[in-house]
């Protein structure tokens, strides 16, 4: 039996006040609909159909490289009409799971429970009990069994008292669903074809209707405006912060962290406030992350220390390495064990060897730097000639004085010393001292220029 997912994503989202389709608005730096697609993939869905309307070209541009069936709903005539647009992609033997592109926080485990609750050839609906169910469709039961769903605008005063609401998420048998969709009518207050009407049809046909419930109602909430979108963002971040703490991270303030990707942590990790994670980030044991740091697609080994306001992107830090404050590691940068870069040091496609240090104010690009090297303040590897990048090699135990320019391609051999203010353009031999600065001159009685009157 195949799992066939239908994601409803045709709404314009007028209340967002945006040219962007509602489902492309982001939670954790990812479109809401992408969260839904990713969850469907976690369920090993055999087929995913995305029913779209407004902004179809934008949706395809953003999502089109994925294996999806894009299905147009030219007119928004209700949820039942939307699902019916995907009927050509549904086989009789399929289990059809209906999801919503603006409901991004539904967990895989919740959907697994929903699918498990569905009896063979039966229907299962994800429902929630709310203290204030206003605005939602109500689950109508008789003798404890579901017999139908009534929308808010069509509900009687007695039905409005029901606090079990329909989330809209449901699992249905493919063959029966296709038959029910063909029988839908729009004689209701909205003049729409409701998917929820198939529940009454299922009851009339003697089909078993079961329910499942999320651990938290936030899993079924969508976003119709930016206030609700912000609430989803906070809920998502709270969930991810809890996951990190349970995995061994100590968060200085769980409400002040921003996780926009996949973060794995070792034991006794310390994360200060306002840290941002993007992409895939791995933190080893006893790692410390200072306030305001940004980590993107990086691998941080045990005991490493990232000080406040550093940006680490596409980089690796070895055991007990440290960076910052205000350091920037760009893609291809790597600090080996016990290496250190300080404030306002930038590295790109550069390796800093074990125990080497660049304390402050340096640019190290396209460089291979050995062990025990000292990089003085103001050092620059001049790696670009206007057309191509070139490599600088600094071997072990080299001392580079402050304000030194290394014009690549160039090699500095073991134990060499470069005097402050030098511009090095040729290879330096082992244990050599190189000084290239101009000889100091003294001019007595020097008169400074005088400003001319305006």
Curated annotation (Swiss-Prot):
Q: Name one GO cellular component term.
A: membrane
For activity, the cofactor(s) needed are: Mg(2+)
Q: How is the cofactor bound?
A: Binds 1 Mg(2+) ion per subunit.
The record places the active site at 360 (proton acceptor)
Q: What pathway does the UniProt record associate with this protein? A: Nucleotide-sugar biosynthesis; UDP-N-acetyl-alpha-D-glucosamine biosynthesis; N-acetyl-alpha-D-glucosamine 1-phosphate from alpha-D-glucosamine 6-phosphate (route II): step 2/2; Nucleotide-sugar biosynthesis; UDP-N-acetyl-alpha-D-glucosamine biosynthesis; UDP-N-acetyl-alpha-D-glucosamine from N-acetyl-alpha-D-glucosamine 1-phosphate: step 1/1; Bacterial outer membrane biogenesis; LPS lipid A biosynthesis
Q: Where located?
A: Cytoplasm
Among InterPro entries, the record links this protein to: Bifunctional_GlmU (IPR005882), GlmU-like (IPR050065), GlmU_C_LbH (IPR038009), Hexapep (IPR001451), MobA-like_NTP_Trfase (IPR025877), Nucleotide-diphossugar_trans (IPR029044), Trimer_LpxA-like_sf (IPR011004)
Instruction: Give a GO molecular function annotation for the protein.
Output: glucosamine-1-phosphate N-acetyltransferase activity
Question: Is Amino-acid biosynthesis there in the keyword field?
Answer: no
Reactions that this protein is recorded to catalyse? alpha-D-glucosamine 1-phosphate + acetyl-CoA = N-acetyl-alpha-D-glucosamine 1-phosphate + CoA + H(+); N-acetyl-alpha-D-glucosamine 1-phosphate + UTP + H(+) = UDP-N-acetyl-alpha-D-glucosamine + diphosphate
- Provide the residue positions that the database annotates as binding Mg(2+): 102, 224
Residues annotated as binding UDP-N-acetyl-alpha-D-glucosamine are 8-11, 22, 73, 78-79, 100-102, 137, 151, 166, 224, 330, 348, 363, 374
Residues where acetyl-CoA binds: 377, 383-384, 402, 420, 437
Q: Where does the protein principally reside?
A: cytoplasm
Which EC class heads this enzyme's classification?
A: transferase
Give the residue ranges for region: Pyrophosphorylase.
1-226
Q: What EC number(s) does the entry state?
A: 2.7.7.23, 2.3.1.157
What assembly does the database describe for this protein? Homotrimer.
Q: Provide the function of this protein.
A: Catalyzes the last two sequential reactions in the de novo biosynthetic pathway for UDP-N-acetylglucosamine (UDP-GlcNAc). The C-terminal domain catalyzes the transfer of acetyl group from acetyl coenzyme A to glucosamine-1-phosphate (GlcN-1-P) to produce N-acetylglucosamine-1-phosphate (GlcNAc-1-P), which is converted into UDP-GlcNAc by the transfer of uridine 5-monophosphate (from uridine 5-triphosphate), a reaction catalyzed by the N-terminal domain.
Protein name per the record: Bifunctional protein GlmU
The record lists the organism as Shewanella amazonensis (strain ATCC BAA-1098 / SB2B)
